[in-house]
Amino acid sequence: MTSPLITKAEVNSVFQGRSLLAEKDFTPAEINYLVDFGLHLKALKQQNIPHHYLEGKNIALLFAKTSTRTRAAFTTAAIDLGAHPEYLGANDIQLGIKESTEDTARVLGSMFDAIERRGFSQKEVEDLAKYSGVPVWNGLTDDWHPTQMIADFMTVKENFGYLKGLTLVYVGDGRNNMANSLIVTGSMLGVNVHIVAPDSLHPSKEVMDIANKFAEKSGAKPLATSNIEEGVKGANIIYSDVWVSMGESNWEERVKLLTPYRITMDMLKMTGNADNGKLIFMHCLPAFHDTETEYGKEIKEKYGLTEMEVTDEVFRSKYARQFEEAENRMHSIKAIMAATLGNLFIPAVPEDFK
């Protein structure tokens, strides 16, 4: 008597096979689960406990933008999980130039078990997910930065032990992908996110509408304001990002607008939490806090500034958590990869979390 053929087993997981393209694609409980899973995997790593959930898997890493943290995090995370990562840069494949995104997605989806994409267009990463047939992870687009969010809120939870009710203040260009992702993710998780920026650099109405919709359920109080004192009052986390991106031509206008919003020790004191152990500083990096880089020297030469979005004093202070945050990129990305590709038993996630 011959045995019946074994068909593909059903995997009882709320994450298996899903793509992470934007935070709002997941529920607040699912985002929180990934945060906690990242903390768990970090503990396993620290104790040298193997966790090869992706043994035999092949991962395509597609980069249209240069990267230090995202590339290093995806590479080491994949290897720790037992997978093989393959880096394909802008000179290796040219989505939409020599081959359409759809055609590229179909080819890569037939060879790889999952795809990471760091680029510009949100539609492009969505099309990769639509046509590849495998999980796609957004390593950054002009609109959203979801993998960074898991790392960021891991870092917050590590430092405070909880999320709900905390206040995170992002100071800088409120229109960029980091501001978008922070205010939406914070509103999902019950964190009050304030965007402190000039009026012309506030998040779009569409982004604020998404944040406010989640805030109705979580109790968070998202805010966009140009008033620094109002915005930073009561902050537990002061967060910053670069003011300008490489290749932009409008540095001068942006620098003039944002110079009053540089994060200083005086700004930290405005929070009211600088002396009680309830305040940290975070930055997704790279940071222009001195003149030790070519761009730092160029900024000094053009604008007479030795510091940009944050002073060197704050960057090197007892409040600084940016390198802990950077390390957490690896652990959080590992959580995303394992949850969506590792055939893990995750039939449900707790709806209640703190």
Curated annotation (Swiss-Prot):
InterPro entries: Asp/Orn_carbamoyltranf_P-bd (IPR006132), Asp/Orn_carbamoylTrfase (IPR006130), Asp/Orn_carbamoylTrfase_sf (IPR036901), Asp_carbamoyltransf_Asp/Orn-bd (IPR006131), Orn/put_carbamltrans (IPR002292), OTCase_ArgI (IPR024904)
Protein's GO biological process: arginine biosynthetic process via ornithine; arginine catabolic process to ornithine; citrulline biosynthetic process
One Gene Ontology term of the molecular function aspect: ornithine carbamoyltransferase activity
Cellular-component GO terms for this entry: cytoplasm
Gene3D superfamilies listed in its UniProt record: Aspartate/ornithine carbamoyltransferase
Amino acids binding L-ornithine: 177, 241, 245-246
Main EC class the enzyme belongs to: transferase
Top-rank taxon, per record: Bacteria
One Pfam family from the record: OTCace
Keywords for this protein: Arginine metabolism, Cytoplasm, Transferase
Listed EC numbers: 2.1.3.3
Record-listed carbamoyl phosphate binding positions: 67-70, 94, 118, 145-148, 284-285, 329
Catalyzed reactions per annotation: carbamoyl phosphate + L-ornithine = L-citrulline + phosphate + H(+)
Cellular localisation: Cytoplasm
Known function: Reversibly catalyzes the transfer of the carbamoyl group from carbamoyl phosphate (CP) to the N(epsilon) atom of ornithine (ORN) to produce L-citrulline.
HAMAP family: OTCase (MF_01109)
Name of this chain's protein: Ornithine carbamoyltransferase, catabolic
Annotated organism of origin: Lactococcus lactis subsp. cremoris (strain MG1363)
